[in-house]
Amino acid sequence: MASEIKKKLFWRAVVAEFLAMTLFVFISIGSALGFNYPLERNQTLVQDNVKVSLAFGLSIATLAQSVGHISGAHLNPAVTLGLLLSCQISILRAVMYIIAQCVGAIVATAILSGITSSLVDNSLGRNDLAHGVNSGQGLGIEIIGTLQLVLCVLATTDRRRRDLGGSAPLAIGLSVALGHLLAIDYTGCGINPARSFGSAVLTRNFSNHWIFWVGPFIGGALAVLIYDFILAPRSSDFTDRMKVWTSGQVEEYDLDADDINSRVEMKPK
């Protein structure tokens, strides 16, 4: 862990997470705000939901392609937690990424607050439960929405696979859009604790905010359980996991497997 913190590449990755998260939150939440919002007569709620969902999904796809080679483009604490539990990053990297993501979200939301300051009752995209939705229902929506996202991330970035084609960032972006199409009418769609945190901080309103941390973290952890232990099991033991968690990310390890159906041994180089 001490050796990783001394590397320039590590800090470049942290900065990349901060910058990409700032752009992501500005673009995505900005799409839900504006001087014609709430909806005008010539718009429908469905049209607006699709617009916002596409903005979230396409911005993730674009930024994942832009900084994925630098940081992995997590841009979501739930994704970071999932990759940590999947033994693909160190504990130090996970902590620094989540801090960078939260700070980036706050900065982006603060900029949006200044730009849209004349809007009446500006929520800055703050997540909350829709009318008639209770906390248990909202939590369930956040769990399912995040589970399918982290499952997509794990599957499309699995280096053991030989059948992958097309663009992983695009697939992940579509997964984000899909999550929003599901959840936006129930919770405003969090599935990203940092994005929810930025809006809560700037509006000083943390009502039901716990849902948008607990739900995504449970969903991310369940995705790892399903993928790494049921669908595509890995045979690394606790010692191997500790080496990744303390010494560095998965690029420093060999994953030996002939195909996706084989069990994998994680061996340090």
Swiss-Prot record:
Q: Which residues form the signal peptide?
A: none
Which Pfam family, an example, fits this chain? MIP
Disruption outcome: Mutant mice are born at the expected Mendelian rate and appear healthy and normal, but display strongly reduced urine osmolality. Besides, their erythrocytes show reduced water permeability. Mice lacking both Aqp1 and Slc14a1 are born at the expected Mendelian ratio, but do not thrive; half of them die within ten days after birth and none are alive after two weeks. Urine osmolality is somewhat lower than that observed with mice lacking only Aqp1. Besides, erythrocyte water permeability is significantly lower than in mice lacking only Aqp1.
Q: Which residues carry this modification: Phosphoserine?
A: 247, 262
Q: Which residues are glycosylated?
A: 205
Q: Which residues carry this modification: Phosphotyrosine?
A: 253
Q: Which GO terms describe its molecular function?
A: ammonium channel activity; carbon dioxide transmembrane transporter activity; ephrin receptor binding; glycerol transmembrane transporter activity; hydrogen peroxide channel activity; identical protein binding; intracellularly cGMP-activated cation channel activity; nitric oxide transmembrane transporter activity
Q: Where is this motif: NPA 1?
A: 76-78
Keywords for this entry? Answer: Cell membrane, Glycoprotein, Membrane, Phosphoprotein, Repeat, Transmembrane, Transmembrane helix, Transport
Where, by tissue, is this protein expressed?
Answer: Detected in erythrocytes (at protein level). In the kidney, expressed on luminal and basal borders of proximal tubules and in the thin limb of Henle's loop (at protein level).
The protein's location, in the record's own words, is: Cell membrane
Q: Name one GO cellular component term.
A: nucleus
State the similarity comment.
Belongs to the MIP/aquaporin (TC 1.A.8) family.
Protein function: Forms a water channel that facilitates the transport of water across cell membranes, playing a crucial role in water homeostasis in various tissues. Could also be permeable to small solutes including hydrogen peroxide, glycerol and gases such as amonnia (NH3), nitric oxide (NO) and carbon dioxide (CO2). Recruited to the ankyrin-1 complex, a multiprotein complex of the erythrocyte membrane, it could be part of a CO2 metabolon, linking facilitated diffusion of CO2 across the membrane, anion exchange of Cl(-)/HCO3(-) and interconversion of dissolved CO2 and carbonic acid in the cytosol.
Query: Mind telling me what this protein is named?
Result: Aquaporin-1
Please give the organism.
Mus musculus
